[in-house]
Each structure stands twice: as C-alpha cells, then as structure tokens.
Regions:
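N-terminal maturation segment of proteins
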Residues: 1-423
Length: 423
C-alpha cells in the first residue's frame, strides 16, 4: 500500500488500487489467525513488531494521500477511509493474537529440510549442487576470501591484524544526520563511473533518490532495501529509491554507536554500485523494457542479486574504490555473501542452528549481533534467496570469460553487459 500510494501512478490509478486492495488486506488479517497453527518464536517476534508499526499506513499515509488527490470523489474517499478504519481494527485483533495466543501453540522451526532444499536447488534454481556440495563450495570460497583479506591487510599495515584494520575502517563514517546525503553522493559517483567508462549502456532518462525507510520496515533489515522504478514519474524520469534506515534520536548510546559502525564509508561506497549503478537500478530498467512478458514480470535472485554483487566486483576491476582500505571492506562484504551460502544451506538442511548462523556472522564476518539477527531472519523466511548473491556472481563471471574467448579482439564489456541484461 505504501509503495503504491507514494509511487508514480496517477491519482485515479491509486484510488482504484486502494478500493480493490484494501478489502483483501482486511480479509488477510482475518484469515491470518486461522492459518498460523505453529509457533516459530523469532517469526512471532518480528511479525508482532511489523503489525504494531503498520497502522501508520492507514492512520496517516492513506489520509495524506486522499488530501493530496483532488480528483477523488466523496464516495470513494468515504469508502477508502471506511476500509482503512476496519483494517486498523483488524490489526488490533491480529496483534493481540500474535502477542497472546500464538505463543501457546506448538513450537516449530523455520527450516524446510534437506530433501526440500535439494529439490529447490535442482528444480527451481537449476543448479548442479546438492546441500553437501554447496556446503563444501561455500566454505572453500569463504576461506579463499579470508586469505585474500589477510594478504591485503598486510599490504595496508603489517603491524595490525585484519580484524584490527577492519574495526578502524568501520569507525570511519559520515555525520549521523547526513546519512542520506552521504549515500546520495556515492550513488551519483557510481552513476558517473558507469557512464563515463561506458561500462553499461543506459538509454533511459533515469535517476536514483536515497530516502529514509518506512518505520514499520526498519526491523526487517539492519540497512535498508532498494525500490526499483515502477514507471516514468511526473517529471519524465524512471526514478528508483534506495531506502535506508535513518539515524534515530530516541536510540540509546549503544544503539547509536552500533548503527554508525554498520554505516561506514566503506559499506556505503561498495554497496552504492550494488543497489544502483550499475546494479539493481539498471538491471530493473532493462527488465522493465524486456519484450518477453515472462522476463519482464519474473526474476530470480541468482540473476538479480548475482548481478548486484557482480557490480561490486566490476567496480573493483575498473578502479572505482578510492584506496586499499575500501578494497579490504569490499572483500569483507564479499565474505558476508560467502557466509550467506553457508548459513542458508546449513540452517535449512540441519547443519547449522539459528545460533550457529548468528555466531558465523559475528565471530567470522564481523557483524554486530543485532545486525546478524536481522540478516539471518531474512534468510530463514526466504530459503535459497541469499545463495543467489555469490553463486549468481560466480556464474556471471564464468559467462563473461566464455564470451571474451568467443569474441576475441572484438570483445566489448559494454556489449557483454547489454546482451546479458537483454536476455
């Protein structure tokens, strides 16, 4: 609802959407308490947080939209307000169910199990791996990345350990209240790099805005999310949004300090290309313009997230990162994606517990516990999605080498990217 009423659609289209969709939300909330028959503790905690913070959409955002839309009829306005009021009531009932009833049901786990996981690898992702070979590959690549990090750390300062250097790097961050501006600066710089070096053709009038993430979503990811353009906006642009969790005044000192070291210059500079230029923003524009309805309306993490991580590597290869410290941070972020392969297959096939996965992220990758929890939570609810980053990147790099051999002297990296994005 929030994305639609704040998106590029016309006022009339948004009204039609609300009238059609609000009754569905009401029905979903009524059905939810009947469908939830098992208690998964962490899911309950997260669901309760989101339910408690979702009422602002119907209390504030919908009303604000109606005030801004002069074309809405009185009947439609009253209908939308009535549905919103009913949804708020249903949210209260559902919130009470989550808080007081669901914990009394039989406790369960989120793992899909070894057999189902292997079927997913074979039939959904069309991969040759099974849970055992994927687990082995994940650890091999994890250890290889660790070795590269140690080698680079010695070049930077041989008197310090890799961990000590990374702590220093993560303590270099923007002014807390200028996080949006800092992210926007490096988004714009990544766009300039892609265009000036002719790495990927971008034939559309487009832009990316960095904005604060909606409050009700801030506990679902420690960082934020990318919201691709849904079409041409009122100014004639395909405008995407990179939504980040902002720095909050009400936090205690510990929370503020932890937030800042997870929003350092390194992570901003490396993640901007992944999310925007030439990552998700550009890939989404090509997908939107694909003549195949199947390709236009469907995707898979092996390509979309693999493409994002590939762009982090592409920026390393083409000299975007300003110094060796940022390059070390890039390797640490790659290690994070290596770990995603390990904990995804590990948790869902029974090789790792939830706490084992948290420990992998905190002890080996360097995450703070709260950030690791949000990370693992996302994987637990979307089995297989997070392996797409590293596995997808490795497949794209293999294709690039094959394409280079085929084209020989006629090889063009821009042409390769364009052909791949247009498939």
């Amino acid at each position: 609802v929030s994305s639609n009423i704040n998106g590029p659609k016309t006022c009339e289209e948004k009204i039609i959407f609300l009238i059609e969709y609000l009754p569905i939300i009401k029905n979903d909330l009524q059905s939810g308490s009947k469908q939830l028959v098992e208690y998964v503790p962490r899911f309950q905690e997260l669901g309760l947080y989101m339910a408690k913070n979702s009422s602002v959409i119907f209390n504030v955002e919908v009303k604000k939209f109606l005030e801004s839309c002069n074309l809405v009829s009185e009947d439609n306005r009253n209908q939308i307000l009535s549905f919103s009021s009913q949804i708020i009531d249903e949210l209260k009932v559902f919130t009470n169910f989550l808080e007081n009833v669901l914990p009394s049901k039989a406790e369960s786990t989120f793992a899909i199990g070894k057999e189902t996981y292997n079927k997913m690898l074979k039939n959904q992702f069309l991969l040759d791996y099974n849970d055992e070979t994927l687990w082995e590959f994940g650890w091999e690549e994890f250890n290889r990345t660790v070795a590269k990090m140690d080698e680079l750390a010695k070049e930077i300062d041989s008197s310090k350990t890799t961990k000590e250097l990374l702590v220093e790097i993560k303590n270099e961050y923007p002014e807390p209240y200028k996080m949006i501006e800092a992210h926007q600066y490096w988004v714009d710089k990544s766009g300039e790099h892609i265009k000036n070096n002719k790495l990927i053709p971008i034939p559309w009038k487009e832009r990316v805005h960095v904005v604060a993430r909606e409050e009700y979503l801030r506990k679902t990811s420690y960082y934020g999310n990318f919201s691709r353009s849904l079409g041409v906006d009122d100014e004639g642009y395909f405008t995407s949004q990179w939504k980040i969790n902002p720095f909050e005044d009400y936090w205690d000192k510990k929370t503020k300090d932890e937030y800042l070291v997870e929003h350092d210059w390194g992570v901003i500079i490396v993640t901007a290309p992944h999310e925007t230029y030439g990552g998700h923003h550009i890939q989404a524009l090509y997908q939107m313009h694909n003549p195949s309805e199947l390709r236009k309306n469907n995707g898979i993490s092996l390509f979309s997230e693999g493409w994002g991580l590939y762009n982090e590597q592409l920026m390393l290869e083409t000299g975007f990162y300003p110094d060796k410290k940022i390059k070390l941070r890039q390797l640490q972020l790659r290690l994070w994606r290596n770990a995603r392969v390990i904990y995804d297959v590990g948790m869902h096939s029974g090789k790792l517990s939830y706490e084992d996965a948290i420990s992998l992220m905190t002890d080996r990758v360097g995450f703070l516990r709260w950030a690791a929890q949000l990370e693992i939570d996302s994987s637990s609810s979307r089995p297989g999605y997070f392996i797409g980053y590293f596995i997808g990147m490795t497949e794209i790099l293999k294709m690039r080498e094959e394409y280079k051999k085929i084209k020989g002297d006629q090889y063009s990296i821009s042409e390769f990217h364009e052909k791949l994005l247009k498939v």
